[in-house]
Amino acid sequence: MAHCARSPSFLLHQVTCQLATGDTLFGPLNLSLEGTLCGLVGRNGVGKTRLLRLLAGLDSPSSGHIERVASVSYVAQQHVMFPDTTLAEWLGVEFVFSALARLERGEGRADDLERLDGFWDLPERLNAGFQAAGLGEFSPGRLASSLSGGERVKAQLCGAFLSDADFLLLDEPTNHLDRQGRAWLYQQLEQWRGGALIASHDRELLTQMPRILELTSAALRSYGGNYADYQQQRELEQQAARAALEHAVTERRRTRARMQKEHDACRRRSAQTLRTIDTLNIASFERVAWKGAAKERPGTLKRQHREQSSILNDAIEQARERVEEDNPVMFTLPGSQVAAGKQVLELDALRLTHSPMAALDWRIDGPMRVALRGPNGCGKTTLLKTLLGLQPPLSGSCRLSVNAAYLDQHLSQLDLSLSIMAHLNLGDTPLEEGVLRSQLAQLQLGADKVHLPLSVLSGGVRLKAALACVLWRREATQLLLLDEPTNHLDLASTLAIEKALAQFPGAMLVVSHDEAFLRALKLTHCLAWREEGWSVERL
């Protein structure tokens, strides 16, 4: 992806952002952002969306300032519209079509020609762009609400790519795109000659970025190279951080041993001095003064040691903050294991109400790991719900022989007003409380999280909680049905969930457009949608 070095499009000077509570979300940030492609990563809640809005000029920084040289087009993650909003209005180009219509009717206004400067061919370009994106012909009067979630994303992206903007600000653009939609976006970015800052956890997309920015609460750090290079640099940083922590701990242990020796020696000298003073032929006031000084020396040394200990403890804490926690291993109950050859699921001439195509005859035997593939709208979610009995089939039957659990991207089976512990208790977990707390701690779900309402916890924590609830209930889960589980997770949470799911000993049926996530699950089969029906492939 060749993008030449250019002058800065944005300059950030001591930019900070505060929440309504007065707490600082991030900053101060200092950065020069050139007109090239750049990925933006960071944990959920750190402020990636807020940073994009600051760069777009939609929000103002709490302090500092942003020099904005480039014209921008911003595509938000959430798309808000009124029910009667047309496509032309939604994309901000209604003025073009209104002016063209007036001119065609011979009712043009004085400023129409000026307003249309550079936009005369926009209808043709929009039409070509929409067709290339698989959206059909562009109809300016079509209601935007008639588009699906993935179609809305592609429509917004089409508008951005066809705009006169120098710089694109894209917030999780692949979240609702299927494989074909993602391939289209990757191609558009390959051909884009302007700059772009793209907040994303899509590793395939980030692999195409020549630069990665990582946002933390304290800084915006720049890494040259794509996502693979970023991972390597972060691993080197973590190796250095772990070495620094080990050195700090060793230094504290060595210093404590030295201080103990100094303390013991000081006490011996003080005791010897006191005994010597008692033998001296000196005035009583001198004796009192000398004894006071001898007794004070251990106290003075103790204060010095306390200050040194505080400095060493602070150094360890600072070093520990730079070390990231290892991804957890998900504990599973023995009952979750599925023996090879055991029938898990059998479909007999199954047809779905959503997509009444050729009947599906299929079965899952043993711990099969199956990817459910197909474009948006083909009926993948409908199939999962039909397998669980949440939705009746059009015809045919489904026979489920094991306990199954379903997790969708919204974790709709969770009551967000309840805590993790409350959910586990409702599931009648067989784990004793001590074991339960220990296993939750292994998932980085400590005492500070397990009693809080899920509504105040991040998406990654909620997903780990949901997995704990379905895997640690008394009736062990042997089949997991996962519907885009990583859609709203940051990279760190996605990696953690990958590792946890890789250990699951049962069967699995998963819907995801994240190829890296699917590879990490070590899939055995693929159930793929075709126009003529579903087909099964061994991987």
Please place each PLM-identified region on the residue numbering:
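Conserved beta-strand-loop-alpha-helix hinge in the C-terminal portion
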Residues: 84-85, 89, 215-243, 529-539
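ABC ATPase nucleotide-binding domain signature region
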Residues: 37-38, 50-111, 366-378, 382-435, ...
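Conserved beta-strand
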Residues: 12-15, 24-36, 64, 347-365, ...
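Conserved H-loop
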Residues: 202-208, 229, 515-520
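Catalytic Walker B motif of ABC-type/P-loop ATPase nucleotide-binding domains
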Residues: 168-172, 177, 185, 407, ...
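Hydrophobic anchor residue at the start of the ABC signature
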Residues: 157, 467, 486, 497
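Coupling and communication elements adjacent to P-loop NTPase active sites across diverse families
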Residues: 2-18, 96-153, 236-354
